[in-house]
Amino acid sequence: MATEYALRMGDGKRIYLTKEKILSEIEAGSSNAADLGDIPDLSTDEMKKLAEILMMPGKAVSVEQGMEVPVTHDIGTIRLDGDQGNSGVGIPSSRLVGCMTHERAFGADTMELGHIDYSFKPVKPVVSNECQAMEVCQQNMIIPLFYGAMPNMGLYYTPDGPFENPGDLMKMFKIDKARESMEHAADHLTRDTVWVMQKLFASGADGVNFDTTAAAGDADMYGTLRAVEVLRAQFPEMYIEVGMAGEMVLGMHGELEYDEVRLAGLWPHEQAPLIAKAGANVFGPVVNTNTSKTSAWNLARAVTFIKEAVKASPIPCHVNMGMGVGGIPMLETPPVDAVTRASKAMVEVAGVDGIOIGVGDPLGMPISHIMASGMTGIRAAGDLVARMEFSKNMRIGEAKEYVAKKLNVDTMDLADEHVMRELREELDIGVITSVPGAAKGIAAKMNIEKLLGIKINSCETFRAQLA
């Protein structure tokens, strides 16, 4: 009887497949992506590598030592304090506690602050509160801290916003009116996003994470790209990550262009150059999970798309790896076995520069991803490598080499807790445990500025207050 291996369906249900069936599923998933995106299939060796990862006997797997990458985040602390019947675990805690828990307990390389409603439009009335929260977090934290939110252009349509719902207009065959409504909404999205981030950057934010870009289609992406363009012009030092909502940009409008490229119908490898052109530092591509397909099919399909996006992108790629995307099952408590295998495959086969940790409970998302492929933040040198990706648009290899040279260590040492513990204390760039008298918060980041030869916005903000 042929040996069967434990895998998952796209909804998280456990299944058992033979090696031959796994390879067949991998081939089919890769072929699907190749056909849709008009891109190459995975090679035979890459398919075998994926099969090996999926058939590994351990519950949790991880990347080979030395291949670790920085992680970024979607939804911020909501996975801890949120309790809306999805992936939040409802722990009563402040956002400062949530951010510091990710930094000190989870070993995150970066973190983000976000509003409970997690869209830019609802932040407007409470932006002063968000600015105060950002200031307090920046005073206490060392890793890069973003402000994260969704463009969420749907909030600008009735009944929540001022413009007529294009869906209703299209049902009445008022196509031109629907397009006009989308264009107005995109203008407001750009304006609101820029206004909010002007306030947050003045309060010390390292940057912004646009989460689920193009959720409302091509006009949503158009408004976001223009916001990125404006922010980059105003704030050359701002860290900007643009993460997508889905694998393909839906053509709700159908005629909008950016840089003379029609946005409707773009796949990840076609999205990347435009996002870089607008001024983003990091691109977060997405590939959707099909809940009725196997994890072998879904992961192969996702890796095929992302590998091509990494190849086409002029900037680092942090693939979105929350529940329901990136080959990960659509389940609020993503299975550790599926998450760690997908994480490893994206690094070792697709060649991503980082992982954008998405929606899911704390164990299933940040803990699993960081154990599988993260650089463990200030336990080692993950925060330093992340800063070079964002401040200088360095790909993972270049960023590691740069930081290793500054520290006078080998790139393998950058994720070595023993090496980095002593070095961080010696250089006074912040350590994960409480050491009396050691530099913390702003002081540690000022030392990081000198070490890496970069500017850090929270330090600039602090210096301006002293003047």
Curated annotation (Swiss-Prot):
Its keywords, alphabetically, are: Methanogenesis, Methyltransferase, Pyrrolysine, Transferase
Record has Phosphoprotein as a keyword: no
InterPro entries associated with the record: Dimeth_MeTrfase_MtbB
Instruction: Specify the pathway.
Output: One-carbon metabolism; methanogenesis from dimethylamine
The catalysed reaction is: Co(I)-[dimethylamine-specific corrinoid protein] + dimethylamine + H(+) = methyl-Co(III)-[dimethylamine-specific corrinoid protein] + methylamine
Q: Which domain of life is it from?
A: Archaea
Name the Enzyme Commission number(s) assigned to this protein.
2.1.1.249
Whether Transferase counts among this entry's keywords is yes
* Gene Ontology biological-process entries: methanogenesis; methylation
| Gene Ontology molecular function: any one | dimethylamine methyltransferase activity
Q: Which family does it belong to?
A: Belongs to the dimethylamine methyltransferase family.
Biological function? Catalyzes the transfer of a methyl group from dimethylamine to the corrinoid cofactor of MtbC.
Q: What is the designated name of this protein? A: Dimethylamine methyltransferase MtbB3
The major lineage groups are: Archaea, Methanobacteriati, Methanobacteriota, Stenosarchaea group, Methanomicrobia
